[in-house]
UniProtKB/Swiss-Prot annotation:
HAMAP family: PS_decarb_PSD_B_type1. Pathway: Phospholipid metabolism; phosphatidylethanolamine biosynthesis; phosphatidylethanolamine from CDP-diacylglycerol: step 2/2. InterPro entries: PS_Dcarbxylase, PSD-B, PSD_type1_pro. Heterodimer of a large membrane-associated beta subunit and a small pyruvoyl-containing alpha subunit. Keywords: Cell membrane, Decarboxylase, Lipid biosynthesis, Lipid metabolism, Lyase, Membrane, Phospholipid biosynthesis, Phospholipid metabolism, Pyruvate, Zymogen. The active site is at residues 78, 132, 236. GO terms for molecular function: phosphatidylserine decarboxylase activity. The modification Pyruvic acid (Ser) is found at residue 236. Is synthesized initially as an inactive proenzyme. Formation of the active enzyme involves a self-maturation process in which the active site pyruvoyl group is generated from an internal serine residue via an autocatalytic post-translational modification. Two non-identical subunits are generated from the proenzyme in this reaction, and the pyruvate is formed at the N-terminus of the alpha chain, which is derived from the carboxyl end of the proenzyme. Binds 1 pyruvoyl group covalently per subunit. This is Phosphatidylserine decarboxylase proenzyme. Its cofactor is pyruvate. It comes from Helicobacter pylori (strain J99 / ATCC 700824) (Campylobacter pylori J99).
């Protein structure tokens, strides 16, 4: 099953990256936009995308405004927030009734502190697929975990235990503006094996590897809130683990990158 799902994702990636003649590609793009009800008002028109991949990875025409105050945490992506809560004895939920151990997801030996609040952001095929820094960050490590590429939609999350932990993923280990540890996890999915990171082009996902790879940064890579960290090639999931922050009521809310979702407590 693992080999099949990963192979399907590689094949899909090859087909989606193919550039058909312009009149054919425009029809393909139009069909995709219609099926998934994509709003292109913030993006280039569909005839400007030379492949499906180009459409999947579309960039915003204009920067979105967001609160620049350093104590405000913003949504890192366009997504539906499916779960959010404080960790309970190192347990987080991929969906209601389906817990997993947070330290396994991010690659730590010891359980994570209950001071961590986690937020699951589900990016559907219609969403803008880039992900951004939710606050000023210093990136210490990027950890790549080879794994399955199972779908991350709700039916699959209800069916497959430890789906996030078993799927291919990249966990960024960082420090936030207060010096607290923060984890930003990009989870792969069927047809979404490739995840790109702008700060390090050496991070290679869906590359037939079967082992964990760690990319360490000394000095740390500094990024500003709102900076474009990278993108999926289709929809998938971001899981954010953050401390010392008060969040709004987020569960089952659709958010846009740049929206204020929380506020850091004063030290």
């Amino acid at each position: 099953m693992v080999a099949l799902s990963n192979a399907l994702s590689r094949v899909f990636g090859s087909v989606a990256g193919y550039k058909f003649p312009s009149f054919i590609q425009k029809s393909i793009n139009a069909l995709y936009v219609k099926i998934f009800k994509i709003d292109l008002s913030e993006f280039e028109p569909l005839e400007n995308y030379k492949s499906l991949n180009a459409l999947f990875m579309r960039s915003l025409k204009k920067e979105r405004p967001f609160d620049k105050a350093p104590n405000i945490c913003i949504a890192p992506c366009d997504a539906l927030i499916t779960e959010c809560a404080f960790l309970d004895n190192d347990s987080a939920l991929q969906i209601k009734g389906m817990p997993y151990k947070a330290h396994e997801l991010v690659g730590e030996i010891n359980p994570l502190s209950p001071s961590f609040f986690y937020v699951n952001f589900y990016l559907s095929p219609k969403d803008y697929h880039h992900y951004h820094a939710p606050c000023d960050l210093e990136i210490l490590e990027a950890r790549y975990f080879a794994g399955k590429l199972l779908p991350v939609n709700k039916p699959s999350l209800h069916k497959n235990k430890n789906l996030f932990v078993g799927n291919e993923r990249v966990a960024l280990v960082a420090k936030d503006i207060q010096g607290n540890k923060l984890y930003f996890v990009a989870v792969g999915a069927l047809n979404v094996g490739k995840m790109r990171f702008n700060f390090d082009k050496n991070i290679q996902t869906n590359a037939k590897a079967r082992f964990m790879q760690t990319y360490s940064y000394n000095p740390p890579i500094k990024v500003k809130k709102g900076d474009n960290l990278g993108n999926f090639e289709m929809g998938s999931t971001i899981v954010l683990f953050i401390q010392n922050t008060a969040f709004k009521d987020l569960k089952e809310k659709s958010v846009k990158f740049g929206e204020s979702i929380g506020e850091f407590h004063a030290n």
